[in-house]
């Protein structure tokens, strides 16, 4: 006689948890892809999906469903949302995102800001199989400069990640968990000073990858904000807004958003207020100011640009004001993550 099949309580609990998470993903998917959903809610849904994708095993049903849900958002007409989708996919450390990102990069009719973010995300994922497509668009005649430069960085990052250089280098411990377009400058026997890193940051004779490394080294010297090097590092970074590369300038604004240091407010305000500045820089400056929303005068500055001529700037201000409200609230997590799943 065949013994009856039994299911252990632990496997039943796992199945129930998986089902609950998949149901949550479906709800978040709906919020993310519904154009009538307020943009801040869609962003919070996106960050929740990124959390699920990054905190579950890469081949799990939950992680794959979350990545599929994020990628479904690429059908949106919002360049701001699509570029954020690409960034989030690059932060998942999951190769399942690569086909979606490759498709965005290869779509020459797509907004250059989205394609740049897709290339950067491929670099963050670090798969050598992506080198071919990245080199193709790095070298493509007539390509948008922002895409060319990003592909150059992504190729260098993947080669560094998979080469001997990474193994031999000693990197300063960072307060930031993000996978960046370049690692910080490696530490030598003596740590480089803010002045030395600032000089490297602005040295246009250096490869872009090395300048980015100086940028992220300066970022790490500015956190926590009470470090003696923090304000000097922020001021050194702010000089990067004078660079000729819009990609470089936008990355300075992104770093300021990570740092949320009050000393960056004047430079960010100037970048946002300059209507001659590239929209990808202004939008990043707006979002960075959103991370400083509890500082005096920041919300008033942002509200001035709610009706900006550039859609990506207008939308960024909406999201930034939502972030500012979060900064002033008692909420512990910006994303819409159910309590049962924990927080990042």
Curated annotation (Swiss-Prot):
Spell out the protein name for this chain.
Deoxyhypusine hydroxylase
Location of this chain's protein in the cell: Cytoplasm; Nucleus
The GO terms this record gives for MF are: deoxyhypusine monooxygenase activity; metal ion binding
Q: What is its main location?
A: cytoplasm
Q: In which pathway does it act?
A: Protein modification; eIF5A hypusination
Indicate the enzyme's highest-level EC class: oxidoreductase
**E.C. number(s) listed in UniProt:** 1.14.99.29
What family does the entry list? Belongs to the deoxyhypusine hydroxylase family.
Q: Name the source organism.
A: Chaetomium globosum (strain ATCC 6205 / CBS 148.51 / DSM 1962 / NBRC 6347 / NRRL 1970)
Q: Which reaction(s) does the protein catalyse, per the Swiss-Prot or TrEMBL entry?
A: [eIF5A protein]-deoxyhypusine + AH2 + O2 = [eIF5A protein]-hypusine + A + H2O
Lineage, uppermost ranks: Eukaryota, Fungi, Dikarya, Ascomycota, Pezizomycotina
Chain spans, region Disordered: 169-188
What keywords sit in the KW lines?
Cytoplasm, Hypusine biosynthesis, Iron, Metal-binding, Monooxygenase, Nucleus, Oxidoreductase, Repeat
Q: SMART domains from the xrefs?
A: EZ_HEAT
Q: PANTHER family recorded for this chain?
A: DEOXYHYPUSINE HYDROXYLASE (PTHR12697:SF5), PBS LYASE HEAT-LIKE PROTEIN (PTHR12697)
What is the role of this chain? Catalyzes the hydroxylation of the N(6)-(4-aminobutyl)-L-lysine intermediate to form hypusine, an essential post-translational modification only found in mature eIF-5A factor.
Q: Does the keyword Metal-binding apply?
A: yes
Source organism, top-level taxon? Eukaryota
Q: Which residues bind Fe cation 2?
A: 250-251, 283-284
Encoding gene (name): LIA1
| Cofactor section | Fe(2+)
Q: Where are the HEAT-like PBS-type repeats?
A: 81-107, 115-140, 210-240, 248-274, 281-308
Q: Which GO terms describe its cellular component?
A: cytoplasm; nucleus
The record's section on InterPro entries has: ARM-like, ARM-type_fold, Deoxyhypusine_hydroxylase, HEAT_type_2, PBS_lyase_HEAT
**Could you give the cofactor binding note from the entry?**
Binds 2 Fe(2+) ions per subunit.
Q: Where does Fe cation 1 bind?
A: 83-84, 116-117
Q: Gene3D superfamilies recorded for this chain?
A: Leucine-rich Repeat Variant (1.25.10.10)
């Amino acid at each position: 006689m065949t013994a009856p099949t039994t299911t252990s309580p632990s496997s039943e609990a796992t199945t129930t948890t998986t089902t609950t998470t998949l149901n949550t993903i479906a709800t978040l998917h709906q919020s993310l892809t519904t154009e009538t959903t307020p943009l801040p809610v869609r962003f919070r849904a996106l960050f929740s999906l990124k959390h699920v994708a990054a905190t579950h095993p890469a081949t799990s049903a939950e992680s794959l469903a979350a990545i599929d849900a994020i990628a479904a958002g690429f059908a949106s007409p919002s360049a701001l949302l699509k570029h954020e989708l690409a960034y989030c996919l690059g932060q998942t450390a999951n190769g399942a995102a690569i086909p979606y990102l490759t498709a965005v990069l290869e779509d020459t009719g797509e907004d250059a800001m989205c394609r740049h973010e897709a290339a950067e995300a491929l670099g963050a994922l670090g798969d050598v199989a992506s080198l071919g497509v990245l080199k193709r668009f790095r070298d493509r005649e007539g390509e948008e400069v922002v895409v060319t430069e990003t592909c150059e960085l992504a190729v260098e990052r993947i080669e560094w990640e998979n080469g001997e250089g990474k193994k031999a280098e000693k990197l300063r411990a960072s307060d930031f968990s993000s996978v960046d377009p370049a690692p910080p400058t490696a530490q030598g026997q003596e740590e480089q000073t803010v002045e030395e890193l600032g000089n490297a940051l602005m040295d246009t004779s250096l490869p872009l990858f090395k300048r980015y490394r100086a940028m992220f080294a300066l970022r790490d010297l500015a956190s926590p904000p009470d470090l003696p090097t923090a304000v000097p590092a922020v001021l050194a970074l702010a000089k990067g807004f004078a660079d000729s590369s819009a990609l470089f300038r936008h990355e300075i604004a992104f770093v300021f958003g990570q740092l949320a240091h009050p000393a960056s407010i004047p430079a960010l305000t100037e970048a946002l207020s300059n209507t001659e500045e590239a929209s990808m820089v202004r939008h990043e400056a707006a979002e960075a100011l959103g991370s400083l929303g509890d500082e005096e005068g920041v919300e008033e500055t942002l509200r001035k640009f709610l009706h900006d001529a550039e859609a990506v700037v207008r939308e960024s201000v909406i999201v930034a004001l939502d972030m500012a409200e979060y900064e002033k609230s008692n909420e512990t997590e910006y994303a819409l993550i159910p309590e049962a799943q924990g927080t990042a």
